[in-house]
Amino acid sequence: MATKFPKFSQDLAQDPTTRRIWYAIAMAHDFESHDGMTEENLYQKIFASHFGHLAIIFLWVSGSLFHVAWQGNFEQWVQDPVNTRPIAHAIWDPQFGKAAVDAFTQAGASNPVDIAYSGVYHWWYTIGMRTNGDLYQGAIFLLILASLALFAGWLHLQPKFRPSLSWFKNAESRLNHHLAGLFGVSSLAWAGHLIHVAIPESRGQHVGWDNFLSTMPHPAGLAPFFTGNWGVYAQNPDTASHVFGTAQGAGTAILTFLGGFHPQTESLWLTDMAHHHLAIAVLFIVAGHMYRTQFGIGHSIKEMMDAKDFFGTKVEGPFNMPHQGIYETYNNSLHFQLGWHLACLGVITSLVAQHMYSLPPYAFIAQDHTTMAALYTHHQYIAGFLMVGAFAHGAIFLVRDYDPAQNKGNVLDRVLQHKEAIISHLSWVSLFLGFHTLGLYVHNDVVVAFGTPEKQILIEPVFAQFIQAAHGKLLYGFDTLLSNPDSIASTAWPNYGNVWLPGWLDAINSGTNSLFLTIGPGDFLVHHAIALGLHTTTLILVKGALDARGSKLMPDKKDFGYAFPCDGPGRGGTCDISAWDAFYLAMFWMLNTIGWVTFYWHWKHLGVWEGNVAQFNESSTYLMGWLRDYLWLNSSQLINGYNPFGTNNLSVWAWMFLFGHLVWATGFMFLISWRGYWQELIETLVWAHERTPLANLVRWKDKPVALSIVQARLVGLAHFSVGYILTYAAFLIASTAAKFG
């Protein structure tokens, strides 16, 4: 007999209803719950899947390289990066009529093409690529890497090549290898690439496979390195008049600390970035030799966690907090590890979003406004999903893996002991922020509507302005720290040697970049609106995780798992209190918050780019300003993307804008209905199907049953999220591209 899906659960495979399919999809990645799963097998499966993941990433980047080389205009773009629009790939669409073909034949192409808003052209250009041949070579190299990764994944599932459980739990060795090997050596390799290939290319000297062994990256060679005279590598940097990609105004330095931006490209100095990666490499290679393995030297993480002595002083543990039992808890719980990793990666991803625009690393990318907007929004949304995932797996850890006896008296136990204080503090912060921020916005909205805008309550963000002034911004006249040339911040070593300060001060006081933008009352308000969103999302997630094992209402919650809908009518009031429900609610708040973040960023930057900062400053202090002067005003291009007079190259975004709204609205159908609705709907559909000629020739074996409450919410949440992001992506790209190309 053919085995039914899913193979991993005999119990589910024998379910006679359509629940079999739904539950199987829900449990497919929950390896722990699969039939016959052992702890060792679990680790091996996850380990092998990492190679598949890497293969997908390599294939994806390879595809980008290949399509740009084949159908893009990289070589033309390199000749004039500021005025040429980069092409992502060609469009072949049999539905295009003449109007559409004409509209999408753009950027100097002879056939319909898509414009690239990912920044890959700027990245490849900055790192030294100049020809389509370079791109093809990269694509083929990554294809080979992808095949190797797939082979490695397959190999590590073969009995002889499956690592043992003890290998996976050897935390010290893994840390050493990841710190020194993964971070350290790869940073060193990147510094090497920048010094040997990218910096010479930026100075008009081509380095390829034919001459890289004979071309010295620095005229002094390695002599200064071996004699300790390292300062030689910083002498004679590129001048302010350097034309990127040519020898005009170029220097010879390879490792510098100039600060600020290259005047022509408006991006960080390549020599500063090479220096940065070299420094990171040194730090991480040292860090990768800190932990004790078979040589018996270095730190034991377990001993550090359990230590109660700090250089002879009695302490409770690391940071004077009790950590006994944490090593075992962390090392034996994949959910605990995943929670930490997602949280760290989420923070890093959000930092990438902030730094991509304020300190742009790629040549000329700051002048491609649509790309900057797309990259900021992309990274902030990803950060949001990662952060919510961190708390979800934290909650699963507490339900499945947390051992109260093993953690008695340590920091985890302490957090659970005083969870009421944590939750109530987050609650009052959220309430305070919500009422006060909304109160100010509503007050301002009303007085503007009544024609007395002078009655608005406008608060200058003086503390934030002080922080900007401390970093060197002169505009506010605070005359403090780096904005005062006589202060200790400006005169202390090494600044008095004019190492990085002049470049930094030029950059922070320039009106043409996004470094420390000038802020006022509108920024003050939206900052607090975002703070409200962040604190409320955190409140929901923290409560969901800390109450995942049990709460006053339902002390035995842990016995019901992560995603129970309710515990029956016998204990009324136990609906909507599982950790899954907290995750579900937090997703909406997360999306809401990132909406505010991206609205703010985009509107503020539209003003900076257009040279009209007054519109944001005047309209952002009341609600109608946001609705009318940001959303409505900037969606006009989308609403007009195609009309009775034909089409333009924004029509695809206009269509996506409509379609995104449709997907988003579909979400509500699943969110605002409970199980009985679905059961009746399905029985009605089945009844109609069985009485419809021809249709009733098609039968199925599974008895149709309704979506559970949790399943319907998942479908609703998926539609809501996808529609929400799709709608804003279309709005963001079209409104920016309509203004700046």
Swiss-Prot record:
Cytoplasmic side: 2-38, 157-172, 288-334, 401-419, 546-578, 673-708
GO biological process, one term: photosynthesis
Positions with a binding annotation for chlorophyll a B3: M669, Y677
The protein's name in its UniProt record: Photosystem I P700 chlorophyll a apoprotein A2
InterPro entries: PSI_PsaA/B, PSI_PsaA/B_CS, PSI_PsaA/B_sf, PSI_PsaB
Top-level EC class as recorded in UniProt: oxidoreductase
Similarity field: Belongs to the PsaA/PsaB family.
Gene: psaB
Co-factor remark: PSI electron transfer chain: 5 chlorophyll a, 1 chlorophyll a', 2 phylloquinones and 3 4Fe-4S clusters. PSI core antenna: 90 chlorophyll a, 22 carotenoids, 3 phospholipids and 1 galactolipid. P700 is a chlorophyll a/chlorophyll a' dimer, A0 is one or more chlorophyll a, A1 is one or both phylloquinones and FX is a shared 4Fe-4S iron-sulfur center.
Membrane topology: Multi-pass membrane protein
Reaction equations catalysed: reduced [plastocyanin] + hnu + oxidized [2Fe-2S]-[ferredoxin] = oxidized [plastocyanin] + reduced [2Fe-2S]-[ferredoxin]
Top-level taxonomy: Bacteria, Bacillati, Cyanobacteriota, Cyanophyceae, Acaryochloridales
Quaternary state and interactors: The PsaA/B heterodimer binds the P700 chlorophyll special pair and subsequent electron acceptors. PSI consists of a core antenna complex that captures photons, and an electron transfer chain that converts photonic excitation into a charge separation. The cyanobacterial PSI reaction center is composed of one copy each of PsaA,B,C,D,E,F,I,J,K,L,M and X, and forms trimeric complexes.
